[in-house]
């Protein structure tokens, strides 16, 4: 973790130098990851919104069979949420509809990465016959992240059922994942 702590601190310093006063972090690593981020942030003048994540990802078969989150992981979620601002889901393709509905009961911030890549968008349709954004709505998210490959219909649903979409054009450009249709998003 020493290298990770070093790079996390370096990132926080870089954000401050560039004028960032608040950031939202989709923190991997479960409770340990959240506590590590809190340690890094102690004594820094930046505001953070930490969205934790448990290390549990369902297989295609579990998603098709609509398997719930096991109780042992529910207990991890409870502990996680005592130490962070909400839940940050990596995507609907790692979760069954049932588990997304379980996450929707969380009373803190709920957010999810969605339609980030063309591959993830198509994978959702292949596994469930539903688009990734449509399935993500089962979470009742406060916001969606990316929506790079969302259809007009997906954007319409998101505009009615979330507070908004967080776009990441700089990350998308550096990863060559495409550019979201921000103009269309603004028109919704």
Give names to the regions the model predicted:
Residues 43-48, 83, 161-162, 188:
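Short coil/turn connectors at secondary-structure junctions
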Residues 65-66:
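Domain-level detector for long C-terminal conserved domains
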Residues 1-44, 72-83:
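Alpha-helical scaffold segments that flank or form the walls of functional sites
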Residues 1, 39-47, 116-127:
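Short, compositionally biased "basic patch" segments
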Residues 56-60, 71-183:
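Active-site core of metal-dependent hydrolases
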Residues 37-53, 106-107, 111-112:
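Alpha-helix-loop-beta-strand connector modules within alpha/beta enzyme cores
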Residues 1, 182-188:
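Short, intrinsically disordered, charge-balanced linker/junction segments flanking boundaries
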Residues 25-26, 51, 90, 113:
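Structural motif
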């Amino acid at each position: 973790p020493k290298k990770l702590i070093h790079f996390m601190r370096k990132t926080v310093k870089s954000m401050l130098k560039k004028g960032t006063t608040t950031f939202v972090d989709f923190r991997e690593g479960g409770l340990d990851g959240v506590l590590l981020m809190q340690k890094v942030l102690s004594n820094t003048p930046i505001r953070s919104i930490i969205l934790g994540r448990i290390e549990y990802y369902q297989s295609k078969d579990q998603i098709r069979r609509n398997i719930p989150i096991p109780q042992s992981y529910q207990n991890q979620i409870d502990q996680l949420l005592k130490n962070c601002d909400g839940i940050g889901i990596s995507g609907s393709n790692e979760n069954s509809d049932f588990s997304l509905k379980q996450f929707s009961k969380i009373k803190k911030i709920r957010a999810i990465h969605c339609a980030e890549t063309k591959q993830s968008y198509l994978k959702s349709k292949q596994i469930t016959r539903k688009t990734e954004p449509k399935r993500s709505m089962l979470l009742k998210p406060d916001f969606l992240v990316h929506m790079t490959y969302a259809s007009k219909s997906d954007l319409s649903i998101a505009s009615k059922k979330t507070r908004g979409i967080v776009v990441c054009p700089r990350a998308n450009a550096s990863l060559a994942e495409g550019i979201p249709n921000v103009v269309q998003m603004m028109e919704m």
